[in-house]
Amino acid sequence: FLGIRPNEKNRVNTGRETFILPVDWSGTFPVFENGLIPMKPTLKMPSGVENQTGKNGYLPSGNFVFKDDFSDKTLDLRWIGLRGPREDFVDMTDKGLRIIPFTSNINEVKPTSTLFYRQQHNQFTAAATMEYKPKNEKDFAGITCYQNERYHYVFGITKKGKDYYLILQRTEKGQASVLGEVKIETEKPVTLQVTANGDDYRFNYSIDGKGFLNLGGTVSGDILSTNEAGGFTGAMIGLYATSVGY
């Protein structure tokens, strides 16, 4: 059956999911385990069934770490393209993944040069390390937390004049507002990080690979929820690049 996991503000950022519970159909109507009594989110495995979650090629569940250095020749199946094949905008190189930016951005209902991973937890940390030097003020690359083209955050590097800036921008109902920006050096790799604790999201960056600095403070994940943005598929975290402005 289908269900949801709301956060502490009763918002749903992980979308509609599939749940499995034992059903007792000894009476006139089926009764799910425990009936109307609240229950824990996990149950013991039935007798004779082995839990192979995260083993032998099966995807993990619960708390886990997913790390991808893009050293394989093909993309992991957990990476998602939007409105088109992933392979249309990525190139696997000796240094990792290279995104070839489209002449479109995530505010449009078009294919985007964004590689997405679904948000699976109400509490998580996601990070990406990139080497990037934009050529003009329309170039942008970084990460995004995305519900749809009208509701999302983008966190990445662009150019203003002769300088490079790290930008955090929030888009709600199609209206964008910059929550923070800071001048940044691009000679070395930059690590971009987003952390979530329920409804609270924080966007951080590291220029030395060790300590992280925050940009924009703590922001709400409200626009990433199905309550605010509509739909039922949940939010995604993405690696994003564009050549037409963010």
Where are these regions (language model features)?
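Carbohydrate-active catalytic/glycan-binding domains of CAZyme proteins
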Residues: F1-Y246
